[in-house]
Amino acid sequence: MLNNLRIMFVFSFFLGIMNAQSSIEGSVTDSNGSPLAGANVVVDGTSVGAATGADGTYQINIPSGTVEGQTVTLVTSYIGYKSQSANVDVPLSGSVTMNFSLEVDAIGLQAISVTALGFEANRDQQGSTSSSINAGDMTRSGESLMANSLAAKASNVIVNPSAGDPGASTSIKIRGANTISGSNQPLIIVDGMPINNSTTYGGGNNITGGRTGGATSQSRINDINANDIASVEVLKGASAAALWGSRAANGVVVIKTKDGAAAGGMKMTYKRTESFDQVHERIPMQDTWGQGRSGKWGTQAESWGDKISERTGGADVVDTSKPYFVSEDGTFTQYTITEKNSKETYVDKNWDAVFQTGRFTQDDFQVSGGDATKTYLFSYGRLRQDGIIRDSFYDRDNFRLNTKFKLSDKVTMTSKAGYTYSNSNRIQQSSNTAGLLLGLLRTAPDFDNTHYRGTYVSGGTEYTGRHRAYRRYLGGSSTNPIYNNPIWTIKEQKSTTGINRLIMSNEMNYSPLEGTDVVLRAG
């Protein structure tokens, strides 16, 4: 019996040692002694910590076998207050007390934004509603164009691309009274200078000679490389309109580009982005019935002719004495058809002649540096985008040099210059007789769009440069095929744009007294 009691005593002794736990406890208050509920208290370098309760107290239970008997650093933090740390000797068992008294962080409480003039100010001192957009979120969006990268980044900001072409313009609207009843866009400010972001459409029903029918222009905001942007502020309110007049009635988008690093020596960064685009789903098209109507082959607009599978097969019967068409490269001749025998269909071939896998690549290189008296940033961005429609593309090269010089304790000079060269071609897609998809979708399944341009010969007379389409399979003496061959739309009715643009902002800041700045800006 005595031996059993000894064993139980020894077992209880070791069990008590095993269950012994160390803890750190205490309170977190402000400088007036008021408790701070929800403050975080963490053992630095670990995930061990606790939050204060309603009375400002906390207790951290130290896991067994971790830091017992060691000196650790305890860190406490609370929104709007300066963080504080202290060294604590953790006992092997039992608890130790550590109290914290935090000071208000006056700087941290000030929400800084950029006003419509490009100056930094506290949000609560502005007469306008503002939203901030993180520049990192914009570049991570994967969008090729700066305007499109603003989508879903700020409340009440509506971003609508005008088309799917590479480099196509984008409409930006800030929700409000003006955007409900109108279509005006906000004013765009880049480094304190207003720029244009217009959206322009070409003519609507242009078939032969026009170069902008149904195609959209570029947006000037997309001349900016998103990787050069430091911050974006969206402003709406009376103060925005007061500064810029009626141009800011629909709000202001304020863009600030990056400055050079003031410390740490020269820094170089390189970034490459690459993506591919494909048509998500094709429009199903029938390949049972040939061109014509009432069960007979013909050159009418409809595709309710004879049943293709019931044809005899082989070559069509033609009349070589009648008008004919010769392709521009001389490899194809089409005579007047008198009897349709061929069972060939071209739905897939015609589709593939219009669409492709799009590709986007962007290379960005930046060099920045400086010291206490000067900073600099140089960047080069190279964007190349081929659209899902063949021959559509958008190429852009960006060069930027931003410098800042502190001439004295009171005078600072800042210069920001960005040069852009962009080149693009966008395809006509409007709902008109020259529209790309109208021509493609209306093409009969038994007509090959490949040979779209050539010479029409009739009665010994040659008509060169004729447009061949499914309703004018010989081209004809007229230049009007009624509905375009979609390959003609791609190859012959280009909407090309070449832009050279320089955006500059030069600023001198003079601070004669503390809290007073005199700014001279030109650009």
Predicted features by range, described:
Residues 1-23, 68, 82-84:
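Cleavable N-terminal targeting peptides that direct proteins into the secretory/outer-membrane pathway or into
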Residues 28-31, 129-152, 160-164, 172-179, ...:
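Short, polar/charged loop or turn motifs at beta-strand boundaries
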Residues 47-48, 53-111, 245-247, 257-259:
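Periplasmic N-terminal soluble interaction domains immediately after the signal peptide in Gram-negative
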Residues 96-101, 111, 146-149, 172-175, ...:
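N-terminal periplasmic accessory domains that precede
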